[in-house]
A protein has these predicted regions:
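Acidic, Ser/Thr- and proline-rich intrinsically disordered linker/docking segments
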Residues: 127-145, 156, 185-232
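Domain-scale macromolecular recognition modules
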Residues: 177-180, 195-197
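Conserved beta-hairpin
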Residues: 122-177
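Eukaryotic intrinsically disordered, low-complexity regulatory linkers and tails enriched in Ser/Thr/Pro
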Residues: 1-141, 156, 230
C-alpha cells in the first residue's frame, strides 16, 4: 500500500508544484513591478466603483473555491466518523483507519497547494487591475468597460486582456503578459465551442482563449496598433 500512497501523492502533488513555481516564484518584468505596487492615486468615481466590483468578485470566487475544496473533505470525514461510531461507539477522528488517513493526506496536501495557488492568482489579478486602473487613459477604461459588458456574469470582472497606455496585458492563468501591440504578427484564431483560441507572436508565441463576444474588441486593438484590416 505504501507504493500506492506515493503514486497518489506524486500524481496530485507534482503538477500543482510545477504550476506553483511558474505562477508564484518565477515572475516576468511586469509581475515584478506589480509585486512592488502600492496604491498612490485616488481613482475617479467610475474607476473606484469598478475596482470595488472587482474586489467583490474576488471575494465571492474565494468563497466558492473554499466550498469546492473543503466541503467534500468535511462530508467524507463525517461519513467515516459516523461509520466508526456505529462500529465502536467512539466518536474520534483518530480512530479512522490508517489507510484511509493516508489516502486523505495524499489527496488533500496537493489540494492545499492548489488552494493557495488559486487564491494567489485571484489576488494577483485583482492587484494588477488596480495598478492598471491608476495608469490607464479614459479611452482605455472605456474599452475595459466594453470588454466587461461582453463577458459572462461569472467573469465580468476577470477580463482576459487589458489595454493600458499603449501596452496590452494578457491574463493567462499562471502569468500576466505585457505586450507591445505594435509587434503583434502572425495572428490567427479558431472557434472551439463557446470560446476562441487566439494565437499570435509578439515576438514570442502566445496562445490564450477569448469568449466570442470579446474577440471584436481584441481585434480592434490589433487593427489600431498594426494598421492591418482584419475581417472576422
Amino acid at each position: 500500500m505504501d507504493s500506492f500512497y506515493i503514486i497518489c501523492f506524486v500524481l496530485f502533488f507534482l503538477p500543482t508544484l510545477v504550476f506553483l513555481y511558474f505562477t508564484v516564484v518565477r515572475k516576468n518584468a511586469f509581475e515584478e513591478r506589480l509585486a512592488l505596487f502600492r496604491p498612490t492615486h485616488k481613482l475617479s468615481q467610475k474607476r473606484e466603483a469598478y475596482r470595488q466590483q472587482v474586489r467583490k468578485y474576488s471575494k465571492y470566487a474565494k468563497i466558492i473555491l473554499l466550498v469546492i475544496f473543503y466541503l467534500p473533505l468535511c462530508v467524507l470525514i463525517a461519513i467515516l466518523l459516523k461509520e466508526e461510531y456505529e462500529k465502536t461507539g467512539i466518536l474520534n477522528i483518530l480512530s479512522i483507519y490508517d489507510d484511509i488517513k493516508m489516502i486523505l493526506l495524499s489527496v488533500y496536501m496537493p489540494v492545499l497547494l492548489l488552494h493557495y495557488l488559486l487564491f494567489y492568482v485571484i489576488k494577483r489579478n485583482e492587484k494588477a487591475q488596480h495598478m492598471l486602473l491608476e495608469q490607464m487613459s479614459d479611452a482605455d477604461f472605456e474599452l475595459l468597460l466594453k470588454v466587461k459588458d461582453s463577458l459572462l456574469f461569472t467573469t465580468k470582472y476577470n477580463p482576459p486582456f487589458v489595454l493600458c497606455n499603449n501596452k496590452l496585458y494578457i491574463f493567462i492563468f499562471f502569468v500576466i503578459k505585457e505586450i507591445d501591440p505594435t509587434q503583434i504578427t502572425d495572428l490567427d484564431w479558431s472557434y472551439r465551442r463557446n470560446d476562441i483560441y487566439v494565437e499570435f507572436k509578439a515576438p514570442e508565441k502566445i496562445i490564450f482563449t477569448l469568449p466570442k463576444k470579446v474577440l471584436p474588441h481584441f481585434l480592434q486593438i490589433i487593427e489600431k496598433y498594426t494598421n492591418q484590416k482584419i475581417y472576422y
